[in-house]
C-alpha cells in the first residue's frame, strides 16, 4: 500500500440531505464537501444526530442526496442503487445468517454475484486466513463470540473486493477490552487489503486510534478534516476542541498575528506564544485552548495562578482541577509514578506553566 495516496476514492461535493417538507424540514446534511483518498482509513466522527450516518448511507446508496454529487473515482454514483456500486457496508448488527456456517456467510455475497464455486472456495479460504478464523470455518455463527462474529462480518464484506468499505459503528456492541482488540484488527485489515475504509463513530478514542484522517461533524456540517494529531492538538473550532478529549478554554487578548502564530495575553497578564487555527481572522480577543497534559503545576509562580479545588486519580494519570485567580477553571493532567500522591493537595496555591507550542487560538 502506498504511504501517500495520490488520488481520491470518494469525493462528496456540496451534498445536502433534507428530510420532511414545509415547516417540518430538517437538514441532516448542509452543503457537505469532503475528499477521501484511495487506500486511507477515514473516519466520520461526531455526536448522535450530526449527519455522519446519513452521509455514510448516501455513499452506500441506501438513500439519495437532495442536492450535490458523490463521486467514486470521478464517476457520479449518487443516482446509482447500492448493488451497482463497488461499495460494501458493515453494520453495527453484523446481519449474519445464524443458520449458515462461518464459511458460508463469508461466501454468500460471492454466490449472489454468480461467481464460480472454485473461485468462491478459494476466496473464502483467503478471507478466513485474513481474519484468522480457519479453525472455525464449519461452525455456525450463532456458536461463536461477538468478536468472532465481527471478524466474519468483515470477511464477508471484504470478500467481493470492494473499492470502498463502509463501517457504521461496528464496534459499539463490544465490551471495552474486545473493542480495543478490534481497533487494532481493523487497522491491520485495512493496511493488508489496501481498501479505502470509511468508518463512522461517536467514539473519539476509536477515531484517534485507527484513522489516517478524521472529519469532525456537527449539525450536518463538517467542521474540520485532518490527521488525528491535527484534530487533537490543532483544533480549529470550539466544538472540535471540546468534543475531542479534555480541553482548557482561556480568554486572551491577541496581538502580532503572523506566520501561523500570535501573542496571547491571558487574564493573568502573562503573554504566551500560541499557534492560530486555519482560517483565523485577526481580532482583539479570542479563545485559547490548552490540553491538560501540555501544562505543568508548580508551587512557584507560573503563567497562571490559582487554587487546587479537586484531585482525581485515574490510575495512569491524575487530573488536578484548579480555580484560577482570574475566575476561569483549568485542569492539569499529570502522569502518575509509583510514588504516592501527586505532590499537591486541595487548597494549595499553585502556579501553572504552559509549555512551548501548547496553546492554540480558535478561529470561532
From Swiss-Prot:
It catalyses: ATP + H2O + polyamine-[polyamine-binding protein]Side 1 = ADP + phosphate + polyamineSide 2 + [polyamine-binding protein]Side 1. Its main location: membrane. Part of the ABC transporter complex PotABCD involved in spermidine/putrescine import. Responsible for energy coupling to the transport system. Signal peptide: none annotated. It comes from Mesorhizobium japonicum (strain LMG 29417 / CECT 9101 / MAFF 303099). One of its GO terms (cellular component) is ATP-binding cassette (ABC) transporter complex. CDD domains: ABC_PotA_N. InterPro entries: AAA+_ATPase, ABC_SmlMolc_Importer, ABC_transporter-like_ATP-bd, ABC_transporter-like_CS, Mo/tungstate-bd_C_term_dom, NA-bd_OB-fold, P-loop_NTPase, PotA-like. It is found in: Cell inner membrane. SUPFAM superfamilies: MOP-like (SSF50331), P-loop containing nucleoside triphosphate hydrolases (SSF52540). ATP binds at residues 46-53. Its EC number is 7.6.2.11. Belongs to the ABC transporter superfamily. Spermidine/putrescine importer (TC 3.A.1.11.1) family. This is Spermidine/putrescine import ATP-binding protein PotA. It holds the Pfam family TOBE_2. It is a peripheral membrane protein. Residues 10-244 form the ABC transporter domain. Keywords: ATP-binding, Cell inner membrane, Cell membrane, Membrane, Nucleotide-binding, Translocase, Transport. The complex is composed of two ATP-binding proteins (PotA), two transmembrane proteins (PotB and PotC) and a solute-binding protein (PotD). One of its GO terms (molecular function) is ABC-type putrescine transporter activity. It comes from the Bacteria. It is an enzyme of class 7 (translocase).
Amino acid at each position: 500500500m502506498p504511504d501517500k495516496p495520490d488520488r481520491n476514492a470518494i469525493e462528496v461535493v456540496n451534498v445536502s440531505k433534507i428530510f420532511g417538507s414545509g415547516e417540518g424540514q430538517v437538514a441532516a446534511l448542509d452543503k457537505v464537501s469532503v475528499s477521501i483518498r484511495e487506500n486511507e482509513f477515514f473516519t466520520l466522527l461526531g455526536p448522535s444526530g450530526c449527519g455522519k450516518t446519513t452521509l455514510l448511507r448516501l455513499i452506500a446508496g441506501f438513500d439519495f442526496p437532495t442536492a450535490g454529487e458523490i463521486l467514486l473515482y470521478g464517476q457520479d454514483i449518487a443516482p446509482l442503487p447500492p448493488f451497482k456500486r463497488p461499495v460494501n457496508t458493515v453494520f453495527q448488527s453484523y446481519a449474519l445468517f445464524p443458520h449458515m456456517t462461518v464459511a458460508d456467510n463469508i461466501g454468500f455475497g460471492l454466490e449472489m454475484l454468480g461467481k464460480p464455486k472454485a473461485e468462491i472456495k478459494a476466496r473464502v479460504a483467503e478471507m478466513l486466513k485474513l481474519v484468522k478464523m480457519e479453525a472455525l470455518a464449519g461452525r455456525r455463527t450463532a456458536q461463536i463470540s461477538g468478536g468472532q462474529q465481527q471478524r466474519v462480518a468483515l470477511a464477508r464484506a471484504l470478500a467481493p473486493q470492494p473499492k470502498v468499505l463502509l463501517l457504521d459503528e461496528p464496534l459499539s456492541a463490544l465490551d471495552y477490552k474486545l473493542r480495543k482488540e478490534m481497533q487494532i484488527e481493523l487497522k491491520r485489515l485495512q493496511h493488508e487489503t489496501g481498501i479505502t475504509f470509511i468508518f463512522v463513530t461517536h467514539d473519539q478514542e476509536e477515531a484517534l486510534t485507527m484513522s489516517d484522517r478524521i472529519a469532525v461533524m456537527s449539525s450536518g456540517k463538517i467542521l474540520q478534516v485532518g490527521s488525528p494529531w491535527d484534530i487533537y492538538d490543532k483544533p480549529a473550532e470550539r466544538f472540535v476542541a471540546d468534543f475531542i478529549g479534555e480541553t482548557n478554554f482561556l480568554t486572551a487578548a491577541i496581538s502580532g498575528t503572523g506566520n501561523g502564530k500570535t501573542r496571547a495575553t491571558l487574564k493573568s497578564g502573562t503573554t504566551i506564544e500560541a499557534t492560530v487555527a486555519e482560517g483565523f481572522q485577526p481580532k482583539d480577543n479570542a479563545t485559547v485552548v490548552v490540553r491538560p497534559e501540555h501544562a505543568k503545576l508548580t508551587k512557584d509562580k507560573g503563567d497562571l495562578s490559582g487554587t487546587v479545588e479537586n484531585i482525581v486519580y485515574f490510575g495512569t494519570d491524575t487530573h488536578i482541577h484548579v480555580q484560577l485567580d482570574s475566575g476561569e477553571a483549568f485542569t492539569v493532567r499529570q502522569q502518575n509514578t509509583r510514588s504516592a500522591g501527586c505532590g499537591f493537595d486541595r487548597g494549595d496555591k499553585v502556579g501553572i506553566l504552559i509549555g512551548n507550542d501548547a496553546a492554540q487560538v480558535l478561529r470561532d
